């Protein structure tokens, strides 16, 4: 077996990249309001707003009749069978509505019918080629 002489490759030179200047550490600050602050942990109500303004659950805000109405309306669909029936009826209604209105608006070919008259006789297309 003969030894194959391989050429000696020179040492690889590392790819040189241009040097980038070192970045300076910069302190980010926003000029907003007093003392140049966006967010003040010491004064949360003025920072985020007063959320307690909307959290009123007293009877004078929601009268008893309104609460009774929503309780009765949601009591009907609180059972699993009732909820499934509601979903099934809604799906059927959506399909029927699409069949009556949506298919015509989409100009589906099945709603238009045939656009051209066909040839009369047996195998008319084959005979016309002969």
Swiss-Prot record:
Keywords attached to this entry: Chloroplast, Membrane, Photosynthesis, Photosystem I, Plastid, Thylakoid, Transit peptide, Transmembrane, Transmembrane helix
Superkingdom: Eukaryota
Protein name: Photosystem I reaction center subunit VI, chloroplastic
Keyword Ribosomal protein found: no
Membrane topology: Single-pass membrane protein
Lineage: Eukaryota, Viridiplantae, Chlorophyta, core chlorophytes, Chlorophyceae
Role of this protein: Possible role could be the docking of the LHC I antenna complex to the core complex.
GO biological process, one term: photosynthesis
Any single GO CC term annotated in Swiss-Prot or TrEMBL for this entry: chloroplast thylakoid membrane
Transit peptide feature range: 1-30
Family: Belongs to the psaH family.
Subcellular location as annotated: Plastid, Chloroplast thylakoid membrane
Transmembrane segments: 85-103
Gene label: PSAH
Region (Disordered): 105-130
Pfam families for the chain: PSI_PsaH
Keyword Membrane: yes
């Amino acid at each position: 077996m003969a030894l194959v002489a391989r050429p000696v490759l020179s040492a690889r030179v590392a790819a040189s990249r241009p040097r980038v200047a070192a970045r300076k550490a910069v302190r980010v600050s926003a000029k907003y309001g007093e003392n140049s602050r966006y967010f003040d942990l010491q004064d949360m109500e003025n920072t985020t707003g007063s959320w307690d303004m909307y959290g009123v659950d007293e009877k004078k805000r929601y009268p008893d009749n309104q609460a009774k109405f929503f309780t009765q309306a949601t009591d009907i669909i609180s059972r699993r069978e009732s909820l499934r029936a509601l979903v099934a009826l809604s799906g059927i209604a959506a399909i029927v509505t699409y069949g009556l209105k949506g298919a015509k608006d989409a100009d589906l070919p099945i709603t238009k019918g045939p656009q051209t008259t066909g040839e009369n006789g047996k195998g008319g297309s084959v005979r016309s080629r002969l």
